[in-house]
Amino acid sequence: MKIAFIIYHEVLDDRVTATLNGLNIDYFTEWENVKGKGHKTDAHFGTRPFPGYNCVRMIAFPEEPILQQLIYKIYELNEGIEKEDDKIRLFQMPLERIV
């Protein structure tokens, strides 16, 4: 089992939602208006100097093939995003148990 966190700029929410729907991934926890800054990326703090927010979706994957399909789709989405700072990030980790 794996768990993945998808982190992306709020303007990409429709694209991420469509991607998840296309893969029949209808199970996730979402955080909106997330403030943050990645390594060598612009900050998103929801302020005038640092506009915008991020969104985070946490998804547990009992089966790894579905996660691999999502990773492939994120690579595809990122090809269409010019600015490196705006690319979608996915962090994958082992998941030991779901209770």
Residue ranges and their predicted role:
Residues 1-99:
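Positively charged, small/polar-rich N-terminal and surface patches that mediate targeting and assembly
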